[in-house]
Amino acid sequence: MNKIKCSLVLLPVLVLLLNSCASVPAEIDASYHEEVFFKNAQEAMDANQYNVALYYYEVYLVRYPENHDKTIAAEYEKALIYYKTKDYDYSKALFEQVLDRYENSPFAIMFPERYKILSEKILLQIDEKLNPKKKNK
């Protein structure tokens, strides 16, 4: 079951990476400190190079799965990228996974509360976008 979830999460990321205009680094230096990933990802997001930002977050998640407070940050940022690119269905699924980690992870006590709060707020916005209320005339 987890392999299926993982595949469903990684497949759109791979498609986005392969189809995007900005090129991602062919290789990331093995000596990069954890903070470099977030710095580079944020710079890419500021430049609207979402595929590059996703790449840095994905590599971070593979290299540093034991740093739980930063892992939840990377997962949140990935969801935010899909929200910004208007892939509301997929971003909704990712934000729900972030919230699920707060509920079910044994490491949830280490997670900064802000990602939970922000995920809940953005999920409400996504629901409004996916299910717009009809205005009475």
Model regions: which residues?
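Acidic, polar-rich low-complexity tracts and alpha-helical solenoid repeat scaffolds
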Residues: 21-137
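Sec-dependent bacterial lipoprotein signal peptides
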Residues: 1-23
